């Protein structure tokens, strides 16, 4: 992790535990919460209606689960990126794979449909650099 970086995370135990293992004391930020899966939260993927899952993956605006759409997540994460780009120094976010996917899509100004084509394993680091209001991807999915 970058030295002397400010750290942010959501308030879940898994991000708190990861931050503690990294020696970080993050500031809670709801913008870094995982994608809200609504009625699908905690359910096994194989138990979900196949047609609804397929529609959800194909359409970033879909919310068959009653939670948050991928477009909603991209907007939320985009707002967070805009805020931290204005801060001096380095920032570390301890967050969830879906949020990291959203960060990459927003930073690269990629098509929202590319969200599901980004694989983010747990306990990895993705690095970006902001300059002049634009983001550049430095590295992705390096093991911690």
Where are the regions that the model predicts?
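Phosphate-coordination/substrate-recognition cap region in phosphate-metabolizing enzymes
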Residues: 1-53
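Short beta-strand scaffold positions
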Residues: 9-10, 75, 94-95
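Generic beta-sheet signal
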Residues: 5, 87-98
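Generic structural signal for well-ordered alpha-helical scaffold segments
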Residues: 74, 78-85, 104
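A short, N-terminal amphipathic alpha-helix
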Residues: 1-5, 82-83, 130
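Amphipathic, non-transmembrane alpha-helical scaffold segments
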Residues: 12, 70, 74-78, 117
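Short glycine/proline- and acidic residue-enriched helix-loop micro-motifs
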Residues: 52-72
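Acidic, low-complexity terminal tails and accessory targeting/binding regions
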Residues: 35-46, 105-144
